[in-house]
């Protein structure tokens, strides 16, 4: 039964399960009707006296912390809403139930109880148990009570166990759920409509990234997991929807580290008749509102810093940031001088670029990004790095694009969206040339999208906000694995599929 090391059934628990079956005790009843959750009991009976009330409550949860006192037991029962103490006495239970509890029910099992509420002498709200029903006999032992589950890899691989034993993890994911709800509410309150666009796409685009590839047998064609929903959402703007968004799962075949996971969540937002300055204001409003709603403050601690989300946030161009923070005036030096300075400062990739504008991006990434602790919009990116953004109205060779940085992490990316179909075609052709030269992250030429622009897209602003990183910042978690329920990890056990050659398609 336990040939696979992923299955960790406990032999003693299996034996107790068999004893219960032989005694005719149902292991897994089909349902159990509660009269109250634990939080409801605590709220309703907070003024209970020391003698059990005449009111009967029926509740259920997972059993923790069993304390044996011979003919009585104390135990902790927990459900999603909270914890309550059980007082179990032999002479108060139906015949045989106390012995069943003592011999076969243990920490981690899920039980239902019927009883009356009272307060102990120290003021602890408790249930005087009149009956116990076993709802689920667990076969795996929980980690030791006082040390919990501290192995990081096990916490990520067995998130279900992490959630059982670590309240901090449960609270993180409660907060994540609330953040996403608040995000949706904010946007719909501003008149945006939520849409769903394809996850399997015949072309990948919307960002520079290496895609995951698959094959559709019936269609007989290669498909890609989306790296961004951008081009489909902008088609909706062409079609007449003026304020659109999608909370999307995106997939990028990239490295895994503390701020990157191959499968991640973003919200992408597009608004007709707006530009990148409008999208910066929208982004600022969304994030500051969510932070205040969740934490009750605009000041949130992250690592050793206190981040202030109170508007207005800092806005500076990339050129200004490199000059003032990185201490390099890019356009005051020629390429050879910049290469020399870059090597002295440890800037990577400088031998692979051929313009000052491309140098600007490399210097920014190496010298500035991790110093942007407070919320900062970096604006005006080189055209070479932004194939979907509109050319800057004042700066030749640049586009109207911004990225938001907080605590040294990129949190959002937005544009005045390119809506000139001929300009877009030229940008795609430049990306295709990069692909021919071996750049796996360059975008594909989406002819249908160019055709859509030919029908006319109004001036449009767009932004994508990383949900996982936003949750990290609000909850104080420094690893993206802490805020994704089931992060990507290398499989522990090799399977035949791992030994197959990668498909040529």
Swiss-Prot record:
**What is catalysed by this protein?**
tRNA(Lys) + L-lysine + ATP = L-lysyl-tRNA(Lys) + AMP + diphosphate
EC number(s) per entry: 6.1.1.6
Against InterPro entries, the record matches this protein to:
Aa-tRNA-synt_II, aa-tRNA-synth_II, aa-tRNA-synth_II/BPL/LPL, Lys-tRNA-ligase_II, Lys-tRNA-ligase_II_N, Lys-tRNA-synth_II_C, NA-bd_OB-fold, NA-bd_OB_tRNA
User: One short Pfam family name for this protein?
Assistant: tRNA-synt_2
Question: What GO biological process terms are annotated to this protein in UniProt?
Answer: lysyl-tRNA aminoacylation
Any idea which positions bind Mg(2+) 2? Answer: 410
A GO term from the CC aspect:
cytosol
Q: Which cofactor does it need?
A: Mg(2+)
The compartments listed are: Cytoplasm
* GO MF: ATP binding; lysine-tRNA ligase activity; magnesium ion binding; tRNA binding
Q: Please, which domain of life does this record's source organism belong to?
A: Archaea
Which keywords are on file for this protein? Aminoacyl-tRNA synthetase, ATP-binding, Cytoplasm, Ligase, Magnesium, Metal-binding, Nucleotide-binding, Protein biosynthesis
CDD domains with a match to the protein in the record: LysRS_core (cd00775), LysRS_N (cd04322)
PROSITE patterns cross-referenced by the UniProt entry: AA_TRNA_LIGASE_II (PS50862)
Query: How is the cofactor bound here?
Result: Binds 3 Mg(2+) ions per subunit.
Binding sites annotated in the UniProt record for Mg(2+) 1: 403, 410
| Oligomeric form and interacting partners | Homodimer.
UniProt similarity note:
Belongs to the class-II aminoacyl-tRNA synthetase family.
Question: What's this protein's name?
Answer: Lysine--tRNA ligase
Which gene specifies this protein's sequence? lysS
